[in-house]
Amino acid sequence: MTPKELALAAVKALDSKKGQDIKVLETGHLTTLADYFVLCTATSTTQVKALADTCEKMLKDEGEMPHHVEGHREGGWILLDFSSVVVHVFMEESRKFYDLERLWADATPVDISEIVKPN
């Protein structure tokens, strides 16, 4: 699976569990951390965990294993690191506080309108 395909598969997984404000940022031209960041907002800590678990399971089913998972105990922000793609699932407050969209403002947004269902 290419990094872009992996990012889009993560979007599908997050959307399937009603993740909100899903965004994909292409970051490969800015950093060696990852080619893509996938950002998603949840409405509760329970949903943060459910979104992260669903994303991890669906990508594992495609043969993609995260190299690192961070934040399960805290629940306000879970990060799934698939090397070329990093998935961030936030509570709204955490997403506003860390404001990765501002931090990575030079990243290229990826159009996911064909994947994400309107709320």
Walk through the language-model features, giving the residues of each.
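A short, glycine/Asx- and small/polar-enriched loop/turn
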Residues: 32-35, 81-84
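Short hydrophobic/aromatic beta-strand micro-patches
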Residues: 39-41
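Long, contiguous binding/interaction regions
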Residues: 1-24, 28-29, 43-50, 57-60, ...
